[in-house]
Amino acid sequence: AIWGLPAWLGIVLVVPCGAVLGFLIERLFVRPLLGQPFLSVMMMTLMLATVLEGLRYVIRGADSFKLPFTPGGLWQLGPVSVIPGTAISFVAALVIFVLLLLLFRYTKVGLSMRVVAADHEVAQSLGIRVKRVFSISWAMSGAFAAVCGVLVGMVFTVTPVMGEVGLGNGLPVLLLGGLTSIPGAMVGGILLGVIEALG
């Protein structure tokens, strides 16, 4: 949107760019903290998020904008009116949820991630390359974060601080659903959404 690229090209490029950014963050900032308490890693990533947000202000200022490919109007599903961006985001979230479930249950990479998340030492004793799994995990996280950024941008206005809203909602979701449970996180997210809607 900022550089005037076609919408489809922007969507195609944002995913690998997110993966590369996630990979670089792991290599440069997270890997040196391997073996340190979880709180140290969390503080590092929060600090890095603040720095990246500051760079966004320097480059583009505080301007907000809408994604140019966001569908307008309303979709009628029987008696129900649905905002297109919200419907697309919901379906995409379900697809990502299913893909992650399949990844963690039926693939070697996914199973390795689960073992590493549970215990680094056990993972190493089983021959799992912990550092490699970390790199893959962060690259995947960056890619999914990029996709989520596009989906959120289809519903809300894109601003430099839009990530803070997701962070503020993400922590309660993790506490409700659990740190290692994708279905639990999904249920926690739905519960939080219902609570916000009713509140």
Q: What are these model-derived regions, one by one?
A:
Residues 4-16, 135-145, 149-199:
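Transmembrane alpha-helical segments in multi-pass inner-membrane proteins
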Residues 32-106, 133-136, 198:
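Transmembrane helix-bundle core of multi-pass membrane transporters
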Residues 18, 22, 79, 119:
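Glycine-rich phosphate-binding loops of nucleotide-dependent enzymes
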Residues 81-159, 182-188:
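Helix-loop-helix "hairpin" substructures at the membrane interface of multi-pass membrane proteins
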Residues 3-5, 33, 37, 107, ...:
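Membrane-helix interface residues
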